[in-house]
């Protein structure tokens, strides 16, 4: 989701700095004070200099938006790439169609026929799409310097019981082909160039014998020399960064789940580089940004003022754009902070603008009859907005795009 700025690293150089394949520095990690994020004053009052543009991106007739968290700007600086979770499918027992959060239809036991990787031109016209049957849960997306598209598939189609089902409930049918928990590199016309990880991944978490297998990879970004960095961990036991060379050969892994200030993450959800080559990690469940040395992964700074970030993007002027999709809804403990997109400086960390959730305060999200439902505190319907928006990107003209999971939208924000 984040743009990769030139930092001049090599695989050998990274290894020489002692990134350990065991996942942490030799010394014990520095611990964050308990509830450190609670001491940070909410940055809710910055001005909003943007208009919200609804319905900008057009899908083909008969297809509606499903969930999306993956959005990126093309090499041309104007076109927009999206990883979308396969729109709509027929409802159960011939009922009305339902919007989806997965390209795997567990009820029918098959993959969607829709292409999940979409490219729109600057007018919102769909110009190309690909990837049908290849991924279950497109989660993160990145465009490298050559214009290639990288997508993380953050889940799999292995049989599971739905939340709330009894332990002895029958499992859904097994798939004919296991898909998921991989990272793909495509050419701009959709040719598969490289695959990282094995299909289905490793749901048990990081395996010392197979550290290059994933479970719920969140985001991917590339270094100037072509090395590949993947952020993994979406609530399970694994929270780490995994480094590969440009051919896909595993180099090392770093980090573990925790609240510490050195080498610990809890849902490293999005990645970006600034112009100095520092690595910004949206450490979502820790309600912070961790700023790391991109060579050693040593922590340089920790910021709480951008809130609970699902998505992060840094432009060439070192302006940082952070999407908070969970405060007050998925995470009520962070309820003093408002959901939305915070904008500020990657140099000094000052927040200068805030696009609040157009759905309004007190809005909750749920699925009703297979459709996303937003409710205001008074019980009335709420409008679509940045509620559950996870991905954020900015084009060369400063237009902001937010990819939304709950409302099933790609929002556009233009200067007032």
Where are these regions (language model features)?
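Sequence-structural signature of mature extracellular/luminal beta-sheet repeat domains
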Residues: 25-416
């Amino acid at each position: 989701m984040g743009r990769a700025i030139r930092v001049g690293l090599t695989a050998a150089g990274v290894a020489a700095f002692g990134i350990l394949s065991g996942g942490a520095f030799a010394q014990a990690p520095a611990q964050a004070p308990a509830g450190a994020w609670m001491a940070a004053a909410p940055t809710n009052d910055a001005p909003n200099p943007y208009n919200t543009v609804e319905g900008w991106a057009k899908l083909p007739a008969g297809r509606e938006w499903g969930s999306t968290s993956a959005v990126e700007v093309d090499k041309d600086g104007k076109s927009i790439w999206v990883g979308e979770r396969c729109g709509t499918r027929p409802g159960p027992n011939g009922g009305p169609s339902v919007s989806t959060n997965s390209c795997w239809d567990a009820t029918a036991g098959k993959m969607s026929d829709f292409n999940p990787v979409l490219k729109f031109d600057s007018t919102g016209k769909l110009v190309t799409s690909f990837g049908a049957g290849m991924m279950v849960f497109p989660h993160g997306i990145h465009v490298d310097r050559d214009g290639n598209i990288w997508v993380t598939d953050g889940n799999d189609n292995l049989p599971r019981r739905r939340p709330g089902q009894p332990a002895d409930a029958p499992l859904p049918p097994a798939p004919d082909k296991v898909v998921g928990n991989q990272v793909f590199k495509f050419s701009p016309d959709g040719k598969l160039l490289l695959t990282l990880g094995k299909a289905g991944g490793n749901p048990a978490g990081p395996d010392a014998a197979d550290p290059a297998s994933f479970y719920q990879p969140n985001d991917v970004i590339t270094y100037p020399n072509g090395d590949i960095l993947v952020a993994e961990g979406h609530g399970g036991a694994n929270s780490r960064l995994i480094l590969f060379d440009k051919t896909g050969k595993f180099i090392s892994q770093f980090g573990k789940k925790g609240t510490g200030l050195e080498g610990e993450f809890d849902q490293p959800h999005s990645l970006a580089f600034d112009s100095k080559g520092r690595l910004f990690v949206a450490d979502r469940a820790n309600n912070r940004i961790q700023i790391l040395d991109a060579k050693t992964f040593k922590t340089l700074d920790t910021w709480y003022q951008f809130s609970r970030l699902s998505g992060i993007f840094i432009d060439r002027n070192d302006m940082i754009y952070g999407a908070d999709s969970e405060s007050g809804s998925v995470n009520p403990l962070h309820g003093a902070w408002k959901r939305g997109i915070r904008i500020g400086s990657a140099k000094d960390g000052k927040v200068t603008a805030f696009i609040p959730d157009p759905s309004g305060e007190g809005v909750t999200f749920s699925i009703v009859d297979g459709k996303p439902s937003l409710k205001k505190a008074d019980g009335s319907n709420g409008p679509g907005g940045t509620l559950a928006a996870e991905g954020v990107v900015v084009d060369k003209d400063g237009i902001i795009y937010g990819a939304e999971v709950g409302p099933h939208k790609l929002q556009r924000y233009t200067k007032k």
